[in-house]
Amino acid sequence: MSTFVVLDQPLSWRQVAAIAEGAPFVLSEAAQLRIRAARRLVESIVDKGIRAYGVNTGVGALCDVVVEPSQLRHLSRNIVMSHAVGVGPLLGRCEVRAIIAAAVNNFAHGLSGVRLDLVERLVSLLAHDWIPDVPAQGSVGYLTHMAHVALVLVGEGCVQRGVERRASADLLRALDLQPLVLEAKEGLSVVNGTPCVTGLTALACLRAERLLNWADVISAMSFENLHGQLSAFDAEGLALRASPNLSEVGERLRSLLEGSAILAASAGRRTQDSLSLRAIPHVHGAARDVFAQTAAVVDLELRAATDNPVVTGTEDSPRALSQANAVGAAIGLSADALGVAMAEVAAMAERRIDRLVNPLVSGLPAFLASDSGAGSGFMIAQYTAASLVAENRRLAAPASLDGGITSGLQEDHLCHATPAALKLLKILDNAEFILSIELLAAAQAYDLQASPLARAPNTDIVYRAVRNRIPHYRDERPLAKDIERARLIIREPTAVDFENEGASESGPPESDWHAQPDAAPEAKAPRSRPPRRRSKSSAPGKTANPS
């Protein structure tokens, strides 16, 4: 289980991602006080008859329609009901947890004005892992997804925990709770702001981080199998590009490939390799740059109050500020950018797969088949990778530019931030499959090398780990199942950490390659140092926990 999270100051993207994967969290006393204070401001606005958007007016193009005090509860409930218009497949457990965590973070700023009871019910949903049904489609920016979460609070909709599914009203009765009656402003606040795109992009950052680490490892395996020229990763040459991430990837690759007899035997054989091998540091390093920028934007978003309006001032002199802080332009653009970066990493991986299966350049049996001709080996797996690259190319078109006009010209500029985050997650899905295919192809290529020269110690660790789970392929079983198994390896958070190999007994314990893939330790940042060679005393097939 991930580290316990106390929501006091704004969460980081890493904390949101940890909560998404199951980490428990609670509101600090200070956060509770801020929420209560903001609620008193809303009550003061209502009592004083101050006109405030969504508090005592309609919403969207109906913003100038004043709502009578007796109808404010009705207004809040109606907002939730009318905004719960999502369609399509349901979001997964982690995605919904990430959205709710970001929403609670937004309320904890103490600028929205919802009651503490509402926020605590959201926290309780996650504590008991009851996941509201939230359809994936239907948002041009925000609103829809959180409206479906809010349905659960008022006794509508359904929730799920594992394989158990219940009507929200039944769950509330089982917990001896009454459906929440939404008060003034709560209907708007609970659907408003950028928690949806922020939560989804935080989760995407965690997945992208893990995938970038794996991309370095898997590309090193392909590089070794294809007898690449290590001079391409020479530190002096890479340092001429002023990019710390480029140099870091180069250092990781050198360390991963240190001690390779395969590469030692092929040194100087070619002047230079193809770009899918030679430019790994440049492409992976650039993708890491974009990742770092996106992660920073998510943290900025979590530190911002993204409700509209926000409430400030004092109980004697309250203010409701109607602006556009709920617009997710910054994070939508960042999600688009990270999607492009991860699509490029995956596209380069597909080119290496093609080189591994092509006997004209690999020096290996055609399509990595154990019996070429009678067996097709990885021929069609490369087709799958090419198909996923093509889909990613379509998905990488920026959602932020889609535009559109809604709500009677009142909302005449749309950022499509949530769609940007959703397609980023889909790009990551495809990239995981592509890199899984490359991992399998690289392991197969090691088996088929013409000479018995030794692999680098670090690539040997990964090869053995793969073979502990997935045997050599001989066309005797559906290859799709192997791809799924490889993807489970890639999704393990600890599986690529060589940094603490050979650590002393007082150091971090080793994790088992055979651990359940959905066990989620606290998320870790990209490695600032390259992997080190494994000590001879360490057992093969294991890696250390993240530091």
PLM feature segments, named:
Residues 1-49, 76-134, 236-239:
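Glycine-rich, flexible loop motifs
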Residues 2-34, 38-46, 72, 146-147, ...:
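C-terminal auxiliary extensions adjacent to catalytic cores
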Residues 53-75, 82-105, 133-154, 163-164, ...:
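FAD-binding core of FAD-dependent oxidoreductases
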Residues 104-108, 124-132, 140, 155-158, ...:
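Alpha-helix capping at helix-to-loop junctions
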